[in-house]
Amino acid sequence: MKKFFIAALLMIFANCACAEEIPENGEGGAASAPANINHVDSIYFAQTNFYELTSGNGRIVLTHYPPALQTTEYSCGPIAALTVLRWFGNNDFDEKTLIRDLKTDTKTGTTLSNMSKFFRELGWEVHDTFDTPHFDDIADFQKFVMKNLSEGTPIMVENVEYGGHWRVIVGCDTMGTENLYDDVLIFEDPYDTSDHKSDGFAVGSLDRFFSMWFDRNDLPENKHEQPWLTARPK
C-alpha cells in the first residue's frame, strides 16, 4: 500500500508476452507507473522472462503463472488473490470485485483472515498462518516453499515491505547448492516497479525475506510474524 502516486500512463508489458494490464479499478498503483521506469539494457537487474521460466537444476517455478499489477495504492491483496484464482482457471473475478469481496480497506489494505475466509467460502482447500506451526528457521520455510511449489500451489505472503504488502511466491531456486543463504524466491508482485521491468514478477533472497517476514497492522499482536496462506480448489 505504497503512497506512490504517479501520472497516469498504463503499463505496456513489452517484454513479457503474457503480462496483462488490468485497468479495472482506476488509474493508480503500479499499473499507472510510467513506461520509462523500464530499462531493457539495465546493468543492475537481469531481464529474465519469468513467465516462460521452467523448473530444473534446483529450481521449482510455476511456469506461465499469470501476473498482474494493482491499479490502486491498496489492492495488493486482491491482486495477489486474483492471480491465484487465474492460476487455477477461475476467471470470475476482477480487481474491483475482489476489493469488495475481501473487504479491503483503503488505508490498511486486506487482512489475512478476510483472504482466507474468501477462499474458504469458494469451497477451496485453505491453509494459513493461523492453523500451522511457526517456522523456526529458514530450512523449515524452504522445505515448505519447495513442497507447495512442487504440488503446483502458489503461496500468498504478506510482509512489512511498503509498510505491509501482499505478494505470491511462485518460484524458488536453490542455486544448486546445499547452502540456504544463496536461495532465491520468485514473486508475483502486484507493485512491481523496482527492478527496471514492470512485468509483475520480482526476485529476492529467501533468507532476507524470512528475516523481514512480519506484519505491522494485519494480524493480532501475538500473530504478527509470518503471514501466509495457500488456497486451491478441492
Put a short name on every predicted segment.
Residues L82-N91, D101-D105, F118-E125, F144-G152, ...:
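Structured segments of extracytoplasmic/periplasmic soluble domains
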Residues M1-F4:
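Positively charged n-region of N-terminal signal peptides that target proteins for export
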Residues C18-L112, D182, A231-K234:
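Active-site-adjacent structural segments surrounding the nucleophilic cysteine of cysteine proteases
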Residues I22-N49, C172-K234:
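Noncatalytic regulatory segments and standalone regulatory/sensor domains
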Residues S75, I79-T83, T97, T110, ...:
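Extracytoplasmic/secreted proteins, especially bacterial periplasmic and envelope-associated proteins
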Residues A7-N15:
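Bacterial N-terminal signal peptides
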Residues P133-E188:
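Active-site-adjacent substructure of cysteine-protease-like catalytic cores
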Residues T108-A139, N148-E151, I155:
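Mid-length scaffold segments of soluble, non-membrane domains
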